[in-house]
């Protein structure tokens, strides 16, 4: 049951939330300095990944992560984020407040040290926090360094305190104000437009991440408010009882990750068992806790998402490994004990068992070992041990206490295994390029001459006629063409044997060379740029969605690593004269070009304005100039910032729930991107 609670939170200092490991002392002595702030403004990408839209939103997340750390320590239960009318962002929590006492080494207020010195904070040296997220503890100082202004307001030690910063440096000493019993921190920053490509925040992006954080921190209320004009503030949050035109959304899930699983499974049809299985354990000596929630549904793909200290570890790690190992062991043992597998039958594979499984794995680790600066894979071996132990014990017990549901789960896995055996020959489609050239590759593939995947690209083109134009208009040195004919399978409604028997899917798998699912190997990818090129109408968008669903469900790393792109063919050809031709990619752009031309005194007949009904209406030269030539084409890279959101979206668009799809279309009807005019 999803609930939204906007009540004012009470002071929770001194309390400990179940499953959250914290330490008691958090003052100036708890702040440890590891390094000075250096060159952040010169090389921002080293600290936040990019200076584009993703990096901009990362600044907000860094402040939110620090507030969430207070919740993990059991001393905060509310975070309010506001996008201000002037483009600033304010993050307020009701935690203990950043320490304001004099730092023993730096000889200045601790808050100033935290905001101006890289690697300074309560996350190091065991001070202040048992567990924490953030970008390796550099968050607050990096946000300050990449902002033109930052204002800090703190309620701690019985008073309100303030300090302002410009370009990362304080403009005045820390000021003490009136006495108060309130505690917490408010940080407001204005991102530097000279550093970032854009300073325009997406309400939808922020709302999705806030909802995710609320799921991962049961009982924590996160509120997002947008004070910009309504034209710029669109809140397309994914909740049926949220107003998509509202400027304020609030998330609170007292069920935590159990509610997360219910939310994800809501679009996936009838669950295989009514209740969500929940597992929780804590090791206080090693500052380690774990929560797991799982439930099977009637779908054919799995949705397993793991988090460490509230950070999505999309590459998995030891927590996922421990979970998967124990899950496979328990289900196979139960299947043998209950004679659901015969003696001669092979064990069920992990892939068989996870078919239709939705699971959230959330661990809090005192000393997390992440692989890479971006924290995408957890490496702590003790986490694997803990997860294996608790999943084995709790899941085996649940199976014993719920025999009917357990049998249904095992039978579903047995059916998946049968389908896997039937699809074994299709799985042999993964071949390297040398083999592909002599094997039964789809004859329709027009390969490129280059053997270098890094410089090669493949266009997946809808229809034979468009494929012919694309083949004639391509640069054969590095551009390959694969026309898609016939019916493209909706993989959201099909088991893997049916998916791999589909002729078009076979062609895609052969051409890419990577294999699918557990056989997937991105090192075998033959083209580092995969471009979906469909008609610029609703039918074309539907075909692109079918292809994206296939890639997301069976070749997700292609999306995660940025190899998938959508072409943007023009909608209109405007022929002013034989020598002067322009192309418009939308109705708005067509109108703008026509108005500008008429202002310049040019005339045009109605029959000189052509609306392309499909790619096949363009000749090879037009297709080359507008859609294929890297110097002129418009491409959109498909990115995956939120896998759980994408999972839910594909379930809505391509799944069995007609009512959810109708609701989604109604909510987004105001967005012109969904209209075929």
From Swiss-Prot:
Its EC number is 5.6.2.2. Keywords: Antibiotic resistance, ATP-binding, Cytoplasm, DNA-binding, Isomerase, Magnesium, Metal-binding, Nucleotide-binding, Topoisomerase. The keyword Glycoprotein does not apply. It holds the Pfam family DNA_gyraseB_C. Mg(2+) 2 binds at residues 535, 537. Mg(2+) 1 binds at residues 462, 535. GO terms for biological process: DNA topological change; DNA-templated DNA replication; response to antibiotic. It comes from the Bacteria. Residues 456-570 form the Toprim domain. Its main location: cytoplasm. Residues 1-23 are annotated as: Disordered. It catalyses: ATP-dependent breakage, passage and rejoining of double-stranded DNA. GO terms for cellular component: chromosome; cytoplasm. Its cofactor is Mg(2+); Mn(2+); Ca(2+). PROSITE patterns: TOPOISOMERASE_II, TOPRIM. Induction: By novobiocin and repressed by sucrose. NCBIfam families: gyrB, PRK05644.1, PRK14939.1. Heterotetramer, composed of two GyrA and two GyrB chains. In the heterotetramer, GyrA contains the active site tyrosine that forms a transient covalent intermediate with DNA, while GyrB binds cofactors and catalyzes ATP hydrolysis. A type II topoisomerase that negatively supercoils closed circular double-stranded (ds) DNA in an ATP-dependent manner to modulate DNA topology and maintain chromosomes in an underwound state. Negative supercoiling favors strand separation, and DNA replication, transcription, recombination and repair, all of which involve strand separation. Also able to catalyze the interconversion of other topological isomers of dsDNA rings, including catenanes and knotted rings. Type II topoisomerases break and join 2 DNA strands simultaneously in an ATP-dependent manner. This is DNA gyrase subunit B, novobiocin-resistant. It comes from Streptomyces niveus (Streptomyces spheroides). The gene is gyrBR.
């Amino acid at each position: 049951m999803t609930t939204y609670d906007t009540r004012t939170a009470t002071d929770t200092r001194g309390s400990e939330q179940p499953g959250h490991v914290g330490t008691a002392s958090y003052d100036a002595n708890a702040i440890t300095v590891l390094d000075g702030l250096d060159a952040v403004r010169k090389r921002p990408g080293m600290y936040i990944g990019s200076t584009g839209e993703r990096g901009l939103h990362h600044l907000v997340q860094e402040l939110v992560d620090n507030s969430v750390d207070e919740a993990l320590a059991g001393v905060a239960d509310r975070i309010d984020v506001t996008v201000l009318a002037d483009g600033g962002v304010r993050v307020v929590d009701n935690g203990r407040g950043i320490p304001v006492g004099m730092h023993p080494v730096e000889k200045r207020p601790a808050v100033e040290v935290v905001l101006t010195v890289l690697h300074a904070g309560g996350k190091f040296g065991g001070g202040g926090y048992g567990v924490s997220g953030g970008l390796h503890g550099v968050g607050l100082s990096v946000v300050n360094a990449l902002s033109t202004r930052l204002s800090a307001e703190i309620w701690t030690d019985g008073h309100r305190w303030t300090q302002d910063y410009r370009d990362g440096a304080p403009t005045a000493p820390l000021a003490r104000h009136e006495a108060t019993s309130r505690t917490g921190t408010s940080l407001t920053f204005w991102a530097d437009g000279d550093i970032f490509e854009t300073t325009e925040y997406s309400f939808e992006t922020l709302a999705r991440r806030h909802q995710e954080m609320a799921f991962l921190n049961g009982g924590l209320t996160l509120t997002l408010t947008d004070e910009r004009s309504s034209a710029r503030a669109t809140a397309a949050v994914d909740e049926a009882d949220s107003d998509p035109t509202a400027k304020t959304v609030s998330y609170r899930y007292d069920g935590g990750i159990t509610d997360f699983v219910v939310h994800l499974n809501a679009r996936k049809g009838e669950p295989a068992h009514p209740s969500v299985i929940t597992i929780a354990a804590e090791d206080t000596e090693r500052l380690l806790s774990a929560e797991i929630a799982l439930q099977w549904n009637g779908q054919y793909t799995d949705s397993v998402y793991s988090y460490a200290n509230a950070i999505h570890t999309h590459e998995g790690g030891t927590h996922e490994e421990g979970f998967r190992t124990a899950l496979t062991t328990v289900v196979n043992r139960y299947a043998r004990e209950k004679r659901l597998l015969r003696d001669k039958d092979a064990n069920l594979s992990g892939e068989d068992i996870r078919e239709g499984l939705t699971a959230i794995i959330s661990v809090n680790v005192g000393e997390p070992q992440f692989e890479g600066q971006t924290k995408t894979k957890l490496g702590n071996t003790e986490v694997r041990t803990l997860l294996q132990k608790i999943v084995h014990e709790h899941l085996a017990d649940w199976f014993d206490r719920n025999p009917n549901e357990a049998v249904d789960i095992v039978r579903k896995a047995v059916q998946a295994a049968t389908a896997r055996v039937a699809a074994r020959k299709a799985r042999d489609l993964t071949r390297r390029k040398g083999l592909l050239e002599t094997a039964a590759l789809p004859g329709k593939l027009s390969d490129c001459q280059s053997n270098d995947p890094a410089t090669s690209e493949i266009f997946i083109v809808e229809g034979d006629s468009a494929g012919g134009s694309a083949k004639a208009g391509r640069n054969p040195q590095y551009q390959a063409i694969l026309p898609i004919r016939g019916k493209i399978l909706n993989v959201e409604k099909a088991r893997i044997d049916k998916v791999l028997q589909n002729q078009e899917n076979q062609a895609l798998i052969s051409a890419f060379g990577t294999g699918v699912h557990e056989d997937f190997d991105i090192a075998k990818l033959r083209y580092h740029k995969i471009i979906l090129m469909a008609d610029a109408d609703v039918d074309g968008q539907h075909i692109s969605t079918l292809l994206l669903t296939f890639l997301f469900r069976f070749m997700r790393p292609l999306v995660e690593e940025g190899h998938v792109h959508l072409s943007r063919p023009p909608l209109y050809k405007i022929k002013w004269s034989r020598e002067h031709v322009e192309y418009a990619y939308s109705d708005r752009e067509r109108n703008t070009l026509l108005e500008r031309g008429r202002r310049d005194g040019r005339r045009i007949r109605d029959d000189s304005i052509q609306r392309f009904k499909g790619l096949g209406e363009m000749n090879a030269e037009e297709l080359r100039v507008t859609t294929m030539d890297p110097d002129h084409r418009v491409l959109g890279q498909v990115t995956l910032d939120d896998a759980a959101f994408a999972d839910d979206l594909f379930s809505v668009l391509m799944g069995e729930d007609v009512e959810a799809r109708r609701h989604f279309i109604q909510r987004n009807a105001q967005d012109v991107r969904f209209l075929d005019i």
